[in-house]
Swiss-Prot record:
Regions of compositional bias (Polar residues) in chain numbering: 63-73, 101-126
Subunit structure: Homodimer. Forms a heterotrimer with a catalytic subunit PAN2 to form the poly(A)-nuclease (PAN) deadenylation complex. Interacts (via PAM-2 motif) with poly(A)-binding protein PAB1 (via PABC domain), conferring substrate specificity of the enzyme complex.
GO molecular function: ATP binding; poly(A) binding; protein kinase activity; zinc ion binding
Species assigned in the record: Meyerozyma guilliermondii (strain ATCC 6260 / CBS 566 / DSM 6381 / JCM 1539 / NBRC 10279 / NRRL Y-324) (Yeast)
The protein's name in its UniProt record: PAN2-PAN3 deadenylation complex subunit PAN3
Originating gene: PAN3
Coiled-coil region: 483-521
Length: 620
């Protein structure tokens, strides 16, 4: 390409037009490199368009004559006069009035001193001058005042165990509680989708407690620790008192009754507190049988702990403390009236036999102590847990009816009166079984003579009918329940074996926790971050303790062929178990930069881990 040097000197270099500079300016470029601005050429220069400024703009940007800012305690209206010299139009700026706020008469009427001018059609040069107005009054947003809620509307009763219940509509600071996430790992698939493993293969579900059992236990813990505001802070020796059942007026006792749970200050355990409202006791006579009830031990009876009177609820009340069984429901809620958020469990003859056997066992234990179950033999006073029923209101009738009991004892004598009460217990058991049979088959209609038309076996019908006529529970058990007791014992032993097998899976979990704790105690300690200290302690790449860092990466920081993190729980458990056993299996450790490869055994890593941990614990 031939270039005329004379004409090229007057032609602007295209590199200047395109890039803003020419790197061949001082290296033989024949074109002109003169620009209309004073921007320096070179690799760090910016395009001419972006750096081009006018003398006026530079003067406005840095003005040495601008007065220094000094805070003033004068009112805001005086600031307009103070800074009037900076902008000649500061007094002409219109006052900002927020939309939706009605203008007051003082704002709508122009004043003589500072008359508000209509906003002219502005240009771009006028925008910076009207951006800030020191005389603008403070902005007060207009918000409608919410109307107070009507006083005559009553709020519906709140269930303390209903999760995700909405809070008050006007309360924006209290959020509804979310349910706990019980599936800490993926639940086991249904049997039809389960993958068949060989005899030597295991998965994560076989290494932990059963998912359903774990979820049940976690729900019980959640119910035990759940609190609810509004109750009294302290009731006798119990704190964190939370209502769990509001019964209103009891159909059995004819008094107002409710159930709470509270934590004892004595032993820290949680107990169920049954409260009877407006019940006054002037002496210790009603509590004379409490010690005998407290010493009663039975698998089918809720143990009574204490009984006392209190005014912590606002009125004189009787409180009886029992053992607490979280998430337990009554027979009435389990089979008759559906509980909120629950479902009814269908009754079968096997379940009826199970209930009959356990009821007879509970009543037999009570009668051996020269006591009577009385009002606790009711569908609403018997709680149900897994394959277990328990009498949950023992001793209440002895306290509530103490005056009538004393009068009857004085009339017929204590032995005769107690014998009559025990006979009534046996009749109540038979009546309760008839009620459950009616739930199963409404044809019975709560009539013991219609049991034969219920479709149940003749053995069960005969057992219930004889129960209403017997006077001796011992002979009744030998005649009707001896064979059924073997079925109950077999079921309980199977349940015990299942729980022991689940417990055995969690028995040695502490070993792996100890290993991970030791590794985290040792690796990446801050006092070994210094190179000199790390070299002296043996943590450099050539040191013996460097193997622990590589092993930590080998266990927890594995990646696949695509570079994604590997989160295989089974692999971590297998590796830590091998480390705990200290087997001689060899494996390869690779550094993060893949420049160091070491073949070691689990035994060597375990010995090194124990040695370093002993060094740390000794303070060396």
């Amino acid at each position: 390409m031939n270039i005329n040097l004379d004409s090229a000197k007057g032609t602007l270099c295209k590199n200047i037009l395109i890039y803003g500079y020419c790197k061949y300016e001082n290296k033989g470029c024949a074109f002109s490199h003169r620009r209309n601005n004073n921007a320096n050429s070179g690799p760090g220069a910016t395009p001419a368009k972006s750096v081009a400024t006018t003398p006026t703009s530079d003067k406005r940007k840095f003005n040495v004559n601008t007065p220094s800012f000094q805070p003033s305690t004068a009112p805001v209206q005086g600031l307009a006069n103070k800074f009037a010299g900076l902008s000649p139009k500061v007094k002409d700026i219109p006052v900002f009035v927020p939309s939706g706020t009605p203008a007051s008469p003082a704002q709508s009427t122009p004043s003589t001193g500072n008359q508000e001018q209509p906003m002219p059609t502005s240009t771009v040069s006028n925008v910076p001058e009207r951006k800030f107005n020191t005389s603008t009054p403070s902005f007060t947003p207009s918000q409608p005042i919410p109307a107070p809620p009507p006083q005559n509307t009553s709020s519906p009763p709140t269930n303390p165990y209903l999760m995700n219940q909405p809070g008050p509509p006007t309360d924006m600071y209290y959020q509804s509680a979310y349910p706990l996430q019980y599936h800490l790992y993926a639940p086991a698939p249904p049997p039809r989708l389960a993958i068949t493993h060989s005899s030597h293969q295991v998965d994560a579900h076989s290494l932990f407690i059963d998912s359903e059992l774990r979820e049940t236990l976690q729900k019980r813990n959640e119910a035990t620790l759940q609190s609810y505001p509004g109750g009294p802070e302290i009731v006798d020796v119990y704190h964190t008192v939370v209502p769990i059942a509001a019964e209103g007026v009891s159909k059995i006792w004819k008094v107002s009754s409710s159930v709470y749970k509270g934590v004892s200050n004595v032993d820290g355990n949680v107990y169920a507190l049954r409260k009877i409202e407006d019940f006054k006791i002037i002496n210790e006579t009603p509590f004379r049988t409490i010690k005998r009830w407290h010493g009663l031990q039975s698998a089918n009876i809720v143990k009574i702990q204490d009984a006392f009177t209190t005014v912590a609820f606002g009125s004189p009340s009787l409180v009886v403390a029992y053992d607490y069984y979280p998430n337990a429901s009554t027979l009435l809620e389990q089979h008759v009236n559906r509980r909120l958020g629950g479902r009814l469990e269908p009754l079968t003859e096997d379940i009826l036999w199970l209930y009959l056997t356990q009821l007879v066992n509970a009543v037999r234990t009570v009668h051996k102590k020269k006591l009577a179950a009385r009002s606790s033999l009711d569908l609403s006073k018997i709680i149900v847990t897994t394959n277990r029923i328990r009498l949950a209101a023992i001793g209440m009738s002895d306290i509530l009816n103490w005056e009538a009991d004393d009068a009857e004892i004085a009339r017929v004598g204590l032995p005769t009166y107690m014998e009559n009460l025990q006979q009534e217990d046996i009749r109540n058991m038979a009546r309760l079984m008839v009620d459950l049979t009616t739930v199963m088959n409404p044809v019975v209609q709560n009539d013991i003579f219609k049991l034969k038309s219920s479709g149940l076996s003749t053995d069960f019908v005969a057992a219930v009918q004889d129960l209403s006529n017997t006077d001796d529970l011992e002979s009744y058990i030998r005649k009707h329940l001896a064979i059924r007791l073997l079925d109950v014992v077999d079921m309980l032993e199977d349940s015990n074996d299942y729980l022991e097998s689940q417990l055995s899976t969690e028995l040695e979990n502490a070993r792996l926790v100890r290993l991970m704790t030791k590794i985290n105690f040792i690796v990446d300690r801050p006092e070994w971050d210094n190179e000199a200290t790390a070299a002296a302690a043996g943590w450099t790449e050539n040191g013996p303790k460097y193997l622990l860092k590589l092993f930590r990466d080998f266990v927890f920081f594995q990646t696949d062929e695509m570079g994604k993190p590997v989160t295989d729980l089974s692999r971590v458990l297998v590796t830590l178990n091998k480390l705990d056993a200290g087997i001689d299996e060899k494996f390869l450790l690779v550094s993060r930069d893949e420049k160091t490869c070491i073949v070691v055994s689990y035994k060597e890593i375990r010995d090194l881990l124990e040695s370093v941990f002993r060094t740390i614990t000794r303070g060396k």
